[in-house]
Swiss-Prot record:
Matches recorded under PANTHER family: PHOSPHOPANTETHEINE ADENYLYLTRANSFERASE
Cellular compartment(s): Cytoplasm
GO molecular function: ATP binding; pantetheine-phosphate adenylyltransferase activity
UniProt organism field: Lactobacillus johnsonii (strain CNCM I-12250 / La1 / NCC 533)
Protein name: Phosphopantetheine adenylyltransferase
């Protein structure tokens, strides 16, 4: 069996992410969940917070290890960790088109590195970290869309923001 990485910003990690990661953990010897930084995104949680939340979520899965590599190319991280595959989740055709393009770049950088695409369940196909943040910003309840530690952290962020406005 080979090792794989599942890179993402995970701001925050959602039930859709968890579903894909849990499924992929059964396919590989080791799955590294890699907290990365996307320079085009504005983050709600710090890198350290995202790392801690993801570690809490997967603390009982010995095949999953959560690490942070904020300023590296995905291909470089895969090389460092001895991973032969990159796992990505798909919700819809827009995700497919985006992931196909990224997989093409990664394949150009390393012809031996494969991308494995896993679909989320249809009932989770609408969940995105951006949608979660937007819903929380306006006071909506997302507790059924994210793991419990994430729901608690989102509630705390919202409470702190509301206290700052007073």
């Amino acid at each position: 069996m080979i090792k794989a990485i599942f890179p993402g910003s995970f701001d925050p990690i959602t039930n859709g992410h968890v579903e894909v990661i849990e499924g992929a953990s059964h396919m590989f010897e080791k799955l590294y969940v890699v907290i990365m930084t996307n320079t085009s995104k504005k983050y709600l949680f710090t890198e350290k917070e995202r790392l801690e939340l993801a570690r809490k979520v997967f603390e009982n899965n010995e095949k999953v290890e959560v690490i942070a590599r904020p300023a590296e190319l995905t291909v470089e991280v895969a090389h460092e960790l001895g991973a032969g595959a990159i796992v990505r989740g798909l919700r819809n055709t827009a995700d497919f088109n985006y992931e196909r393009d990224i997989a093409g770049i990664n394949k150009t950088l390393d012809p031996d590195l494969n991308t494995v695409l896993l679909f989320t369940r249809p009932e989770d196909s609408f969940i995105s970290s951006s949608m979660i943040k937007e819903t929380v910003f306006f006071g909506g309840d997302v507790s059924t869309l994210v793991p419990k530690p994430v729901a608690a952290a989102l509630e705390e962020k919202l409470r702190n923001r509301n206290n700052e406005k007073k």
